């Protein structure tokens, strides 16, 4: 990718990244390292096997996609199911965990969910450790963007549903990417910790309106005897 285009992206990402106030060195250093790596490697190109048939030239050569704010149209889209049918629901709106629209009643206390934004404020050391364990340092361009622009996301902590072998916790995750007010980006980090013997089924659904760079990543910490089934 052209160096000047990557420099433009790097400068824009740096400005946004510096607006997030991190209280612990681990998070600050992770942002700084990610930004430095992104400046070095840029976006993936055809030499990267997973992107060989998905050229990103138009993204890399365009102005940096601003991080989108909470949508004003999500509720108008009728995306939320009326009946849960025994499935919990997590809503992520332009990268922001929406506790007000999520419903975990189907899984009770067996699944604990917390926004990464609240963890950044209240438990920054724990978040730093979870990120380090889930996403060891690498030079994947989109992981670098996720680290540099980490603001919100979701941490899902799963315990066994019961003493009955094989019982599965089912969670419907709805991502809404809304670029109706103008093009932009949404960077979502999901952290999943599954205790010994726990089983979970994730049903992930993505809706997009307008032009949005949706950057979604999941880090999974599986204990012995646990299981995760992801449907996307």
What are these regions (language model features)?
Residues 1-232:
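Glycine-rich and polybasic anion-binding loops at the starts of cofactor/ligand-binding domains
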């Amino acid at each position: 990718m052209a160096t000047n285009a990557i420099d433009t992206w790097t400068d824009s990402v740096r400005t946004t990244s510096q607006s997030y106030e991190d209280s612990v060195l681990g998070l600050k250093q992770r942002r700084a390292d990610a930004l430095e790596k992104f400046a070095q490697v840029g976006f993936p190109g055809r030499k990267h096997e997973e992107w060989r048939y998905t050229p990103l030239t138009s993204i890399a050569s365009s102005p940096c996609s601003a991080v989108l704010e909470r949508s004003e149209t999500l509720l108008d889209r009728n995306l939320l199911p009326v009946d849960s049918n025994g499935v919990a629901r997590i809503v992520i709106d332009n990268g922001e965990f929406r506790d007000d629209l999520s419903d975990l009643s189907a899984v009770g206390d067996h699944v604990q969910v917390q926004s990464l934004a609240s963890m950044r404020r209240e438990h920054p050391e724990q978040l730093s450790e979870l990120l380090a364990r889930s996403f060891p340092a690498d030079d994947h361009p989109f992981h670098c963007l996720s680290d540099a622009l980490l603001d919100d996301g979701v941490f899902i902590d799963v315990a066994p549903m019961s003493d009955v072998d094989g019982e599965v916790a089912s969670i419907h995750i709805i991502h809404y990417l809304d670029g109706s007010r103008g093009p932009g980006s949404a960077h979502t980090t999901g952290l999943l910790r599954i205790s010994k013997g726990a089983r979970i089924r994730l049903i992930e659904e993505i809706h997009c309106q307008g032009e949005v760079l949706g950057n979604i990543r999941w880090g999974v910490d599986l204990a012995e005897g646990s299981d995760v089934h992801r449907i996307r």
